[in-house]
Amino acid sequence: MNRRHLLKAFAASAPLLASTSLVAAPKQDWRTLAQDVRTQMAWAWRNYVERCFGQDQIKPVSGRAEPFFFPGGPPLGLSIIEALDTLYVMGLDAEAEEGIRWIANNLNFDIDGEVQVFETGIRIVGGLLSGWHGTKEKRLLALARDMADRLSPAFTKSPTGMPYRFVNLRTGAVRDPVSNPAEIGTYIAEWGTLSKATGDKRYYDMAKRAMQVLFDRRSKIDLVADTINIETGAWVSRRASIGPPSDSYFEYLWDGWQLFGDVDFKRMYDVHTAAIVKYQAQQSGGHLWFPQVDFETGVVLDHHQSELAAFYAGLLAQGGDMARGKAYLASWADVQAKFGVLPEGYDYARAAAERVTNELRPEFVDSCLNLFLLEPDDRYRELARLHYEMMKTSSRAAYGFTIIDDITTAPMKQGDLCPGYWWSEQMKYYWLLFSDADRFDYKNNYLSTEGNVFVGLK
């Protein structure tokens, strides 16, 4: 199927979610499609193993390695760790064992270098925990705890309990107090899971305290801005957004309730969500969007939508607002129909791409999966199928799948990077949507903001 045919298919699919009178999705052979996803995953993995095994990321056009944590320093095998539970749930057991052997023989966090606490938490700690959940390899749990301990000074050295952005893995030295909601409030899933696994409540408590302190600094209209000084607790900006750098804070408020039954998280989620719906939800051209607003007045600041904000459709549905969740997914489905591949940034007031790159983002398909888990219906699968087919058409390169530098050119101009999260998120979401996977519990499950499965692997 070429790009023109795919765009026609996208356009035909746009009404699928446009109203509550839903149109049935076209008949598809989902199991065959799932096997294709598995085949593509295995092919990409083999290229990574042959070209740069153990390196953080692969550049699929050139076949070279790309560091993530320490440019010029030791890699942490990021792509291996991100891929572990995806390989497991797909039944690619030889590949998973290959990754575990590399981790057991090579991974060592005693490095005199600093890491970003947020990224390391969701990617390394989270990836090791989900790998442990699937494979039961005790070494993975021990490494997850080791890394969490090395990140802990970011919390314990903070006068407020909100973490610093960077920490040295060997010395515990911390840096950069000017942070944001996502980097402050996206730990409870990983840290809480670690507390349950080890019996050590310290991890849960430090993650919860950071979120509570941030929540307590909300404005009088119950919104948070996107930049704050964690030492003083003073806001540095007035911009409120459901997108980055605030997005996963809202996600983890719900997740703290879903995973651990902690009513404090449910209360905080409800307070913020009511304010977001009141001050940020906006209809434009028949679509639901969430503009950036002043967090103290609710005045609209701009109409930019980051592709990362597409996750919010699934979160709204999980939180009980299925109607708005469907409506927001429909808005993004129309953007997908317009461009074929979602742009990194979209201005809904101008109906134009603000950022023409595509970073192999998974958030749209993440929402398709979350809605599918709540309401199994092939319309969500169909939107994800179109997303997958276009990824194959536009992003497949000699040695894997790559980002796109410009989605508006014909053909689309490829970049040269496969982000670590591609292994953890995008391919897993496709597989779970298309396969009826026998290693996944579709009734009782939990996936983190990085797509790591902490509950539900069989």
What are these regions (language model features)?
Residues M1-S13:
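N-terminal secretory signal peptides and thylakoid transit peptides that target proteins
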Residues V23-K458:
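Glycan-recognition and catalytic cores of secretory/periplasmic carbohydrate-active enzymes
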